Amino acid sequence: MAKHTLYLVTYDRGVYSTTGKTKPYHWLFFIQVNFGGEKNQGIVHQLRGMPGGFYYRGPEDLDLNKSGTLKEQLEVGEVDDSRLSRVHDILKDVRIETNESSTWNCQNWTLDGFEKLKAEGFAYDYLTAEAIKHWLREGQ
């Protein structure tokens, strides 16, 4: 049975034009299914939208090498071929904040999802949400 590496990936979203401060990075899950040459293809699970209108669309195909402002790629676990759909089943049930004035974002969703994936053995036991936040923080 083939195993695929599970990553947390961040994207740089630039800076706020009014303050010059770095915007929070966009975080997502990436399951690498084909790597070699110029390809880094896989399945993405990410939160989309804006505060008050966030949604999870489900698995999306993506080649990370062609995906824009990639910042970091942190290996967090493995997924067997036969369990790829279980990742979606877990992530579709992760709570999404609907309060428009909240500071909650894709990073919160990803960390909540990480804990659920870890509980089912997809993510490495030694990783913690605090360590991930530190490694993937803005402004490094």
Residue ranges and their predicted role:
Residues 1-48:
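N-terminal accessory segments that precede or flank the first globular/catalytic domain
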Residues 2, 6, 22, 50-51, ...:
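Alpha-helical structural elements
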Residues 5, 9, 53-54, 120:
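Intrinsically disordered, low-complexity segments enriched in small/polar residues
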Residues 11, 15, 59-60, 110, ...:
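Generic alpha-helical secondary structure signal
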Residues 21-23, 56-61, 88-91:
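Surface-exposed beta-strand edges and their flanking turn/coil or helix-capping segments
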Residues 29-30, 35, 54, 114, ...:
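Phenylalanine-focused residue identity feature
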Residues 33-78:
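Cysteine protease-like catalytic core of ubiquitin/ubiquitin-like
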Residues 64-140:
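Active-site nucleophile-His-acid catalytic modules used for acyl/amide transfer and hydrolysis
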